[in-house]
Amino acid sequence: MKVVSSYGVEIKKQNIPIRHTLYIYRQAVGYLIRVYEESWEELSRIVNLQKRFNAAEHLVHSTKKNRARYDFDQKFPKMPSYLRRSAIQHALGSVSSYETRLELWKQKKLDGKPKLVYENHAMPVFYRDVMYKEAEDQTDRAFLKLYDGHDWKWFSVNLLHTDMEYLRENWSGVKASAPTLEKRHHKYFLRFSYTEEVSLSKKEVNEQIICSVDLGINTDAVCTIMRSDGTVLGRKFINFPSEKDQMYRVVGRIRRFQREHGSGQVQSRWNYARRLNMELSRKVASAITTYAQNNHVDVIVFEYLEMKGKAAGKKKQKLRLWRKRDIQKLCEQQAHRTGMRVSRVCAWNTSRLAYDGTGEVIR
């Protein structure tokens, strides 16, 4: 099984033209989306995706043997070839998705007419050797080819030391994909993806050891290590009270601010609360998988928690802040990296009925 993991390395603040590069790349993608929307009837006849991509590139890029139909090369001169192909791929995907959704809408299989967005939020990929180079002396630096407003030049960028230490410690020897530029919280990152080939546990059901996880609101998780015959080998209560207390205090301050000033200026405060909540999810997921790994578990079992509709009652805000799905997704990613499987069971009657099917549990 292939497991893909990614990690974002922060680019330290310095005088490099990242915003110029991002602007020109998004302008190129927007231009290409308009071109391929006009030419989609011609491109859609080409079934083979590679041939369709080649035909799309020939429409906008001139060579010795090809004369482009559109003036892309004049509008975006000297754009690196790999960056141009990345923009073409993004534009083709956007137009193809729009046309597919439009057909579904015409067949009344989709509610609401889809809209093709030209003002996109595409992020460039820095392909190795032509757009991105690592520093040879193993320092916290890299070289990126960026647009300075006049030409494409190589710039040295400093990367955050702690992020680079993490990559050297945990991902040394694993081949990384070309980094993608990312912007989060007014900061820029280079996101690296790593692909690993892992083999999951193949033990027979009767020989498996499972970790049953009961996610909760007051107590973050209760982990029980069990054999197939019901023998309990261990139990652990996972709770992060200080982190939850910090988050609830932030939510309380937001509530008081909204009561006095309205809800027009609280977006940044809610973003901070969400980041605290997501960090809590990461800690809970890491604690679950670490405990399961220490007990040589084959399968981590969760309840399938599906909560639809409007929550009611005094605890409705706590229910909405409960990131049960994020915890399960993070656990699944971490468990697969270590060879453990993840399973989900229906939550109905899991406390009422006995594990072996003998009936209701008398308490």
Each language-model region and where it sits:
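Nucleic-acid substrate recognition interfaces
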Residues: M1-R363
